[in-house]
């Protein structure tokens, strides 16, 4: 079940504040965030985010096709190591 349209997208206040400040200064420095739940909005296009995956920060460059998705979708938290191959 998705979020109600009446509420609008969720974006962490501190994150949107940093993005707007960067837009005013026309700077494109990476923005470090732990807010994986924040939705990507059109004003974030062209910015680079460092999204925490639980262990380290992964770099995510926001493009037009990412709008409407969440930052955490582009920073996987689990690594699958293949099962051992049986010899015989």
From Swiss-Prot:
GO molecular function terms attached to this record: rRNA binding; structural constituent of ribosome
What GO terms describe the biological role, i.e. biological process, of this protein? ribosomal small subunit assembly; translation
* Keyword Ribosomal protein appears in the UniProt entry: yes
Function (record text): Protein S19 forms a complex with S13 that binds strongly to the 16S ribosomal RNA.
UniProt protein name:
Small ribosomal subunit protein uS19
Q: Which organism is it from?
A: Chlamydia felis (strain Fe/C-56) (Chlamydophila felis)
Cytoplasm as UniProt keyword: no
Q: Say which family it is in.
A: Belongs to the universal ribosomal protein uS19 family.
Q: Which keywords are on file for this protein?
A: Ribonucleoprotein, Ribosomal protein, RNA-binding, rRNA-binding
Q: Which Pfam families match?
A: Ribosomal_S19
Q: Which GO terms describe its cellular component?
A: cytoplasm; small ribosomal subunit
């Amino acid at each position: 079940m998705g979020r109600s349209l009446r509420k609008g997208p969720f974006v962490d206040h501190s994150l949107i504040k940093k993005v707007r400040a960067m837009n005013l200064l026309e700077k494109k420095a990476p923005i470090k965030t732990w807010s994986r739940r924040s939705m990507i909005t059109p004003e974030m296009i062209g910015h680079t985010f460092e999204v925490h995956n639980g262990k380290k920060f992964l770099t995510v460059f926001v493009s037009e096709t990412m709008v409407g998705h969440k930052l955490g979708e582009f920073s996987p938290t689990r690594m699958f190591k293949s099962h051992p191959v049986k010899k015989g």
